[in-house]
Every structure is written in C-alpha cells, then in structure tokens.
C-alpha cells in the first residue's frame, strides 16, 4: 500500500493537498492522531492500496523523539511504500492568509498571538519538516498551481525512482524553500538589457539562441551537469525520492529559465525522471 503523510504549518495548503490526493484515488484521513497511524494502516490495508493522512500540530505526541520513532517504524517496517510531504509558506504569507480568512490558528487557543502561534508551530513541526521527502513552499502558488504541482509530483514518480526537479526562480521574489541545491545565474549576460530580447523568456528561441552563444553560460550549465551527474547516484542509493535544483536570476524570466530547460533536457536524455517548474514566469495568476 502507498502511504503519503501530509503535514505542514497551518494555512500552508494541507487541505488543498488532501483534496487533490482524494481526487487521485487516495483514501484520505484528516488530522489523525499520530499514535493511531499504525492501527489505521492495519485496518485499511486490505481495502485500499493508496492512503493519505494529514497530521495536524494539535495531534502530535508530547515528545518529538516519540514522533520520530513512530514515523521511522512505519517507514522501515515494510508494510507500506512511505512518502511524506511538508507544506510551508513565509510567515508574512501565513499571517496574510489568516487575516483574510478570519480563521483562528490552532495554537491561538493557548493564549498566543497569531505571530507567536505561527512561530511555536514551526518549532513543534520541526521533526516532520526535517524528515520530509518533499517540501513544497506555497508562498507564491495559486490554488491551481499547487494542485497541479501535487499531481505532477505524485503521478510523475515511479516506484523507488528519484525524481529530479529543475526549478527556475527570480531572486527578487525570494529563494524557493523546497530547493536542495541553488545556483545563482545573476553574474551571466542578461538578455533583459537587450531591448529586442527583453519581451521574451528563456523558453523563446531568440533568448535561447543568444544565451547558447555565450561561453560563460554554456560552461555554467556544463559544470552543473557534471556536479549532478557525479552525486545523483549517491543520492539515489540514499533512498531520496526527490532532488530539487533551483536556478535563480534576477527576475526569473530569461537566464534561469533557459538554464533550467537545458538541464532538464540533458538529464531526460540520460533517462532520468525529470520535472521542470518556472516559479516566476507567470506571477499574474491569483495567489493561494
């Protein structure tokens, strides 16, 4: 049976994630007390082959060590194919979402302000965050974007196969929190300053032609390829499910997009399971 444990700070998108997983055929249980997880697996494994469980900060055991031990036991005992997703967003975004929804934070009942509750939740969820197979930062995601991202991550993964995600972004919007590696392309020649190239993106042929003619750009790409090709086998042997490679330039329109596309193409040719995401190409969609 496949098991996905969904966790994350309140307001980061867990409810959306569970709804998407239900649409994908998962039997979903919301806010399950963690100590009941082994019993739940036993009770439903004969009826369902896909199970998703959402863990809320209110349902954690008192001891972080007990939480880590229990999840490690479920992961290692071999009854299920275990994956864990952790959803998060910047503090300012969570504050904004709570202000707009007028909902009460789960920890606000403990006489904490909203800001204090968010910081306390960060501490309590640290064991889940640090051991997650996939971390998704929803700060700049619309509900549609988040739904599509979850579908891609779940459906695009074959059993025991590492998924290599290339993610372009603009530093002006912040570094993606889900990136395992981040490469800074801001020192490379910038098509933004060439009037006839400025309106295009790194996916368009005029920009691609210009950047591919720049020796520094191509050497940068080659060196990233070589580094990843060297260390991916070690990550695969370490049972990693996902490796996310962030490529950043100033605005996330030209250089980072081109480089991410080139790297994705190169590793597809090597037979890797590759996914690509351009975080800031279209920031006009309604945000989550």
From Swiss-Prot:
Query: By its UniProt entry, which HAMAP family does this protein fall under?
Result: RapZ_like
Q: Would you tell me the protein name for this molecule?
A: Nucleotide-binding protein AHA_3920
NCBIfam families given for it?
A: PRK05416.1
* UniProt keyword Nuclease present: no
Chain sites annotated for binding GTP = 56-59
Under the heading InterPro entries, the entry gives: P-loop_NTPase, RapZ-like, RapZ-like_N, RapZ_C
| Single GO MF annotation | GTP binding
Tell me the organism: Aeromonas hydrophila subsp. hydrophila (strain ATCC 7966 / DSM 30187 / BCRC 13018 / CCUG 14551 / JCM 1027 / KCTC 2358 / NCIMB 9240 / NCTC 8049)
Instruction: Describe the task this protein carries out.
Output: Displays ATPase and GTPase activities.
Keyword set, alphabetical order: ATP-binding, GTP-binding, Nucleotide-binding
Q: Which family does it belong to?
A: Belongs to the RapZ-like family.
Its transmembrane ranges are: none
Which positions does UniProt annotate for ATP binding?
8-15
